[in-house]
C-alpha cells in the first residue's frame, strides 16, 4: 500500500517537465543539493531510482564536517529523536597491536549546538535526509519522483561546446513498460554515487577516464550484535590497520544499542596485487579476521552476525590523479555539476563521504543562479565550481 501511494505521488510529480534544477540521486548529497537549491528559490526535480527507505552500504559514521549541514537543513532533531550512537572519540589500532584513542573536540561542537559525531544505520540517516529534502523541494514548488530510472542524459552541441539539457527515464525501472518521461533543466546535478550516469556522460564527452582503480576503494560491511567492548549510547569508533588488511583497514563502528557496523576497505588496485596466498575477497578476509585474528577472535566469541547484512560496494576517492587536467577528475560541464561520490570526493584517509557530499551539495547552490543561468549553466560557471570543489575538498 505504501509503494502504491508513493507511485501515485510520483505520477502527479511527473506532470511538470521543465525545471531550474534536476538532481539525479536522492542520497544525502542529492537530497541536500535539492534542498539547498530549492531554498535559493529554484524549481527543483529530485529523482531517485529506489523507493525509500533503502539500505546503503557504508561505515555509518556521520562526522563533524556533516553536522552543520544536517542542522541547517533541519535533520539534526530527527536524528536525536531516533536510536543512534554518539561518537566521542576514534581508536586507531596498528599492526603491532598498539592502540591510541583520539578524543574528538566535544566542547567546540557543543558551542555550535552539535555533538562531535554520530553513528547510525544509513537506511535510517539517508531516509531522514531524503524526507527533509523532499519536504523542502515541494514547499518551494518542485517535484520528487522515486522509483525512476534515468536511462539517458540529454545533451546538445552549442557552438562547439557540449551542454547537458536534461534526462530521460521511466518510473518502475529501466525495463518497465511505462511511458518514457523527458525532463529538461538549466542545470542537472549528478548525485547518483560512484556509477552516476551524469558523471559518466561528463567524462565520456571529454574523452577522459571515469574510473581509476588506483583511486577506487572496495568496501565490505556486515552488522554484528554484542561485539565485546562496544555498545551503549556513546563512545569510540575503531579503525584498525592490521597486516592482513593492509593497505586498507578494518573498522568497528557501533550504531545503536549493541549493534556494530563491522567492515573492511582496501584500494581495488592494491587488492589485486596481493600475493596469491592472501588474494581473497574482502568478505573472506573479514571472515578470517573475525574468526582467527588473535586480537579480534575473542571479541566476536559471543557475538551474532545479523543475517542479510553482508554487502559490498565501491568508494571513489578524492585523491590526486596523475596527469589529470582536473582534480580529482572532471566533475562539471556546461549544464551539469556532480556532488559527493559522483564527483569522486570520498576522503582517501577515512573513507568518509557524507561530509564532502553535503559540502559539495551546498556549493552547487552557490554556483548556480537561476536568473543568471536561464539559458543554462555555463561552461565558465562549471570551471569555477570545479576549481572551488578541488580547492575546498581535495587539498
Model-derived features: positions:
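Predominantly flavin-linked oxidoreductase catalytic cores and closely associated redox partners
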Residues: 132-295
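N-terminal Rossmann-like FAD-binding beta1-loop-alpha1 element of flavoenzymes
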Residues: 21-45
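Active-site-proximal substrate-binding core of FAD-dependent oxidoreductases
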Residues: 366-387, 395
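N-terminal FAD cofactor-binding segment of flavoenzymes
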Residues: 57-95
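Short beta-strand to alpha-helix junction loop
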Residues: 109-131, 276
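Single conserved hydrophobic/aromatic residue that forms the stacking wall/gate
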Residues: 1-7, 11, 385-395
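Glycine-rich FAD pyrophosphate-binding loop
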Residues: 39-58
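FAD/FMN-dependent oxidoreductases across multiple families
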Residues: 270-272, 276-367, 372-373
Amino acid at each position: 500500500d505504501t509503494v502504491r501511494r508513493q507511485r501515485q505521488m510520483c505520477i502527479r510529480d511527473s506532470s511538470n517537465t521543465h525545471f531550474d534544477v534536476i538532481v539525479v540521486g536522492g542520497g544525502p548529497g542529492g537530497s541536500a543539493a535539492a534542498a539547498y537549491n530549492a531554498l535559493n528559490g529554484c524549481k527543483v526535480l529530485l529523482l531517485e531510482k529506489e523507493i525509500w527507505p533503502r539500505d546503503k552500504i557504508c561505515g555509518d559514521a556521520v562526522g563533524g564536517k556533516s553536522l552543520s549541514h544536517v542542522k541547517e537543513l533541519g535533520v539534526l532533531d530527527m536524528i536525536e529523536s531516533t536510536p543512534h550512537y554518539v561518537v566521542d572519540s576514534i581508536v586507531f589500532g596498528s599492526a603491532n597491536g598498539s592502540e591510541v584513542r583520539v578524543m574528538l573536540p566535544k566542547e567546540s561542537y557543543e558551542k555550535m549546538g552539535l555533538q562531535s559525531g554520530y553513528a547510525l544505520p544509513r537506511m535510517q540517516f539517508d531516509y531522514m535526509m531524503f524526507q527533509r529534502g523532499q519536504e523542502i523541494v515541494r514547499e518551494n514548488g518542485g517535484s520528487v519522483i522515486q522509483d525512476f530510472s534515468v536511462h539517458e542524459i540529454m545533451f546538445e552541441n552549442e557552438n562547439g561546446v557540449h551542454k547537458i539539457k536534461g534526462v530521460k527515464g521511466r518510473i518502475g525501472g529501466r525495463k518497465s513498460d511505462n511511458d518514457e518521461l523527458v525532463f529538461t533543466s538549466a542545470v542537472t546535478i549528478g548525485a547518483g554515487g560512484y556509477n552516476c550516469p551524469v558523471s559518466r556522460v561528463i567524462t565520456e564527452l571529454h574523452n577522459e577516464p571515469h574510473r581509476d582503480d588506483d583511486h577506487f576503494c572496495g568496501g565490505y560491511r556486515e552488522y554484528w550484535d554484542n561485539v565485546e567492548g562496544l555498545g551503549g549510547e556513546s563512545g569510540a569508533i575503531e579503525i584498525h590497520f592490521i597486516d592482513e588488511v593492509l593497505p586498507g583497514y578494518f573498522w568497528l563502528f557501533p550504531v545503536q544499542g549493541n549493534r556494530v557496523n563491522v567492515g573492511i576497505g582496501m584500494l581495488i588496485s592494491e587488492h589485486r596485487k596481493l600475493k596469491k596466498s592472501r588474494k581473497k575477497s574482502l568478505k573472506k578476509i573479514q571472515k578470517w579476521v573475525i574468526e582467527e585474528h588473535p586480537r579480534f577472535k575473542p571479541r566476536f566469541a559471543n557475538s551474532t552476525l545479523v543475517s542479510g547484512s553482508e554487502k559490498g560496494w565501491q568508494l571513489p576517492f578524492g585523491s590526486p590523479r596523475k596527469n589529470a587536467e582536473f582534480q580529482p577528475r572532471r566533475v562539471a560541464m556546461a549544464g551539469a555539476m556532480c556532488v559527493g561520490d559522483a564527483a569522486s570526493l570520498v576522503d582517501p584517509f577515512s573513507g568518509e563521504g557524507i561530509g564532502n557530499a553535503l559540502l559539495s551539495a551546498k556549493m552547487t547552490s552557490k554556483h548556480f543562479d537561476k536568473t543568471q543561468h536561464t539559458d543554462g549553466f555555463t561552461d565558465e560557471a562549471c570551471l569555477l565550481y570545479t576549481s572551488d570543489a578541488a580547492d575546498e575538498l581535495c587539498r
